[in-house]
């Protein structure tokens, strides 16, 4: 009986995922896709409809002869996913319907003094949950810029200052024990979204997130390597300068330390850019470079050289056909990307780097 229940649960999950991925799919198509009998599929679909996970939208036009099939969709009206993105100085929060619509979103500031786990917990229960109403929370996702060691229930992030000895995972599990809950790496989430919504057709590609932290996610044969915990690579802590500045990880000259958003002020000043003239505003280095500012061009080129050295080594190790650059790095504009494309060709294994295309997210 237990085995049968487990098989049925797996089949329910499979049916739901297929409906979620294929808008307007029919029972007949589900039967063909899953190799399950039509009565079995109908029974599974009926259970998902009764429990308000799916809706039957009635008959739709079909090229086939005979009775027209009924269209199935996920029930976005009744089901939500809660998402909390843990950043250094704020929480980005959202409630997403099962059919991928934003029902609610906000930003919650964080201070250095606050206990971040307590803040996240109170944000969920006091701000997000009241917005849910009678709808169902299908799951809670907490996204972090760091490594998630699910097996040992540990996370490590130099960006938000969490170490392996901090009992963050255990505290979250205790706080959210009544809800399906997961921790996800931010770069893995961005990469998956790129793969699904930007229609990436390359089976082997790398997504590089250049923000305050720098991370990479690798896809091989259309599959994310080692899941969404950020354990496949610590690209941001590859050293591009062994004599470079000290990184929070204890290494010197890490990509994150010299190319990440937190390094921009230091590097801009080193290139002779007078930041006092911006009076608290963020400098738009892309616009400055396009307007011919020599110092801004020097800054962007230097950043591209350092990032390209790391990318070329990643290409030599992994041999992707595509590298997608996302995050705040895209704000450095076309001059940054063109320099990356040029500089990648100057290092790494020529046969690999010459067959890899780089583009923005």
Q: What positions do the PLM features span?
A:
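Glycine/GP-enriched mid-protein hinge/lid loop-to-helix segment characteristic of carbohydrate kinases
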Residues: 105, 116, 179-287
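Acidic-glycine-rich active-site phosphate/pyrophosphate-binding loop
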Residues: 170, 226, 231-240, 341-351
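Short glycine-rich anion-binding loops that position phosphate/pyrophosphate groups of nucleotides
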Residues: 145-148, 211-213, 329
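Short, acidic, Ser/Thr-enriched surface-loop or helix-capping motifs
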Residues: 97, 150, 219-220
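ATP-binding/phosphotransfer module of carbohydrate and carboxylate kinases, centering on a glycine-rich
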Residues: 1-66, 71-136, 255-361
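Short, acidic Gly/Pro/Ser/Thr-rich loop/turn segments
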Residues: 89-91, 147-149, 215
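Short glycine-aspartate micro-motif
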Residues: 71, 81-85, 137-141, 205-209, ...
């Amino acid at each position: 009986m237990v085995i049968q229940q487990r098989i049925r649960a797996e089949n329910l999950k499979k049916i739901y995922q297929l409906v979620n991925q294929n808008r307007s799919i029919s029972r007949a198509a589900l039967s063909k896709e899953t190799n399950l009998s039509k009565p079995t599929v109908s029974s599974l679909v009926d259970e998902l409809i009764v429990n308000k996970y799916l809706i039957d939208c009635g008959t739709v036009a079909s090229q086939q002869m005979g009775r027209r099939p009924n269209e199935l969709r996920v029930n976005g009206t009744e089901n939500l996913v809660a998402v909390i993105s843990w950043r250094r100085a704020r929480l980005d929060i959202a409630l997403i319907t099962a059919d991928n619509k934003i029902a609610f979103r906000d930003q919650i500031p964080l201070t250095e003094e606050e206990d971040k786990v307590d803040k996240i917990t109170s944000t969920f229960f006091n701000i997000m949950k009241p917005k849910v109403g009678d709808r169902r929370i299908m799951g809670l996702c907490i996204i972090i810029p760091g490594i998630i060691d699910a097996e040992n229930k540990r996370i490590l992030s130099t960006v938000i200052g969490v170490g392996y000895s901090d009992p963050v995972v255990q505290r979250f599990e205790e706080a959210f024990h009544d809800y399906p809950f997961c921790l996800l790496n931010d770069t893995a989430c961005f990469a998956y979204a790129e793969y699904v919504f930007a229609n990436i057709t390359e089976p082997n590609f790398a997504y590089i997130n250049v923000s305050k932290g720098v991370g990479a996610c690798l896809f091989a044969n259309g599959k994310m390597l080692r899941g969404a915990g950020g354990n496949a690579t610590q690209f941001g802590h590859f050293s591009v300068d062994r004599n470079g500045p000290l990184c929070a990880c204890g290494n010197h000259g890490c990509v994150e330390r010299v190319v990440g958003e937190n390094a921009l002020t230091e590097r801009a000043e080193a290139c002779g850019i007078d930041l006092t003239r911006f009076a608290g505003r963020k400098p738009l280095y892309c616009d400055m470079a396009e307007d011919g500012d020599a110092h801004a061009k020097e800054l962007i080129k230097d950043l591209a050289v350092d990032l390209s050295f790391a990318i070329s080594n990643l290409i030599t190790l992994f041999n992707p056909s595509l590298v997608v650059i996302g995050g705040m790095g895209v704000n450095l504009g076309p001059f940054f990307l063109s320099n990356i494309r040029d500089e990648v060709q100057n290092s790494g294994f020529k046969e690999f780097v010459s067959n890899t295309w780089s583009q923005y997210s």
